Amino acid sequence: MKKRSRRMQELVGKVEEQLYEPLEAIQLLKQISTAKFIETVEVHCRLGIDPKYNDQQLRATVTLPNGTGQTLRVAVITRGEKINEASTAGADLVGAEELIDEIQNGRLDFDCLIATPDMMPQVAKLGRVLGPRGLMPSPKGGTVTFDLAQAINDFKAGKLEFRNDRTGIVHVLFGKANFSEEALLGNLKAVQEAVDRNRPSGVKGKYWKSIYITSTMSPSIEVDYNLLRDLKLTENT
């Protein structure tokens, strides 16, 4: 078992084993995010799903109202006039078969891949490369579309795709540790609502098991899901 650093031991000591009210959890997380760089903030949702079954798998998108704090590199696979549309809309990489070949040969310098439906038969052969990295375009994720300008703008502005892992946990980044408390709370609420809105049809019993927030170099803090679910935010949050 890896030994904790003195810094981590001190931070763990500041987090009590309890359910925290959402804003209180965010305030504490900001206090313990003391690395020498701006840490990324994530939420981990442990759900009562069995990913072995298709009707219990979760894959959806969330638009963070206060952005991600990251500069997202968007790649687009399309052809013809759509290439100009994608470039004009701000895509970082655009191409057809040649971009597919580059990706197959190891090019992965992008965070999001969008494809037009007519290119999906060719994109399908990239499944082994893109699938494990969560980059495979999908209609559910909003990354298979002819409306390239809208999709590019949405993802650049803070739209994220998320899915459960093999153990039924969903991991979603929801900002940076230097965001205001209100901005992080608004983003966290958006994630909770998106997970609830896209509840898989095959789920039986309790859907939410636990929800934790953490930053890159901090211990995790458990949030009271019921309080988060019932939270009403003002329009400017």
Curated annotation (Swiss-Prot):
Q: Which domain of life is it from?
A: Eukaryota
Cited InterPro entries: Ribosom_uL1_bac-type, Ribosomal_uL1, Ribosomal_uL1-like, Ribosomal_uL1/biogenesis, Ribosomal_uL1_3-a/b-sand, Ribosomal_uL1_CS
Write out the annotated subcellular location: Plastid, Cyanelle
* GO molecular function terms noted in the UniProt entry: rRNA binding; structural constituent of ribosome
Q: Which GO terms describe its cellular component?
A: cyanelle; large ribosomal subunit
Keyword Plastid annotated: yes
| Principal subcellular localisation of the protein | plastid
Q: How does it assemble?
A: Part of the 50S ribosomal subunit.
Q: Which family does it belong to?
A: Belongs to the universal ribosomal protein uL1 family.
| Alphabetical list of NCBIfam families matching this protein | rplA_bact
What is the designated name of this protein?
Large ribosomal subunit protein uL1c
Its source organism is Cyanophora paradoxa
